[in-house]
Amino acid sequence: MKKILTVFFIFVFALFCTAAEKPRWTGQPIYVYVPEYGNMSVLMKQAFTAWQTKSRSLVRFKFVSSPSNANIVVEFVDFVGNCYDVNAVGCTEMETRGGQYYKSYVTIGTKEYVRRYEGGRSVRELRTRSKEHIYGVMLHEAGHAIGLGHSEYAKSIMFPYDLESMQYLTDEDMRLLYKKYH
């Protein structure tokens, strides 16, 4: 009897330790709130859908109309403030409960300053980021929202630099996702 109890407690302990080391979303679909913000909303939904499609529904999303019903809440702002001591275009914060993800907050900065020359002088102009300047960031932040960290592989959307040239998910991104959810 002692051996059975010992094996049982070791099993339960290992189960809890594994969960604590590997937080992830346990319920599917993951409910996502994306506020109406013109083309930015469309692109953000496309970013989540790209993860679902490329992963063959390993992660699934359902878009909801209220942040109170969502696991992942997206917010659009002109500029992201300080994100973990880094000036960023996007930022994701995760909350865990019982060792698993409970809530995620994704903030996307929609504006950028562009310098142009007018009458021989430099003028700073505020404009909305184009798809080329924001979609890679949205894919990257959606990856963080499902629990992925940064990758050291430069051709991964989870690589923290050069997101302007990255507009798609790669096999490396899927490797990271499968490692997290299998």
Language model feature labels by segment:
Residues I4-F13:
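Sec-dependent N-terminal signal peptides
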Residues L15-A19:
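Sec/Tat signal peptide C-region and signal peptidase I cleavage site
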Residues E21-K45:
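Fold-level signature of zinc-dependent metallopeptidase catalytic domains
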Residues I30-Y31, V106-T107, E112-R115, A154-Q167:
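Surface-exposed aromatic
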Residues Y37-M44, R127-G136, S151, M166-T170, ...:
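Solvent-exposed, acidic/flexible segments
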Residues V42-M138:
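Metzincin-family zinc-dependent endopeptidase catalytic domain
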Residues A142-I157:
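Catalytic Zn2+-binding segment of zinc metalloproteases
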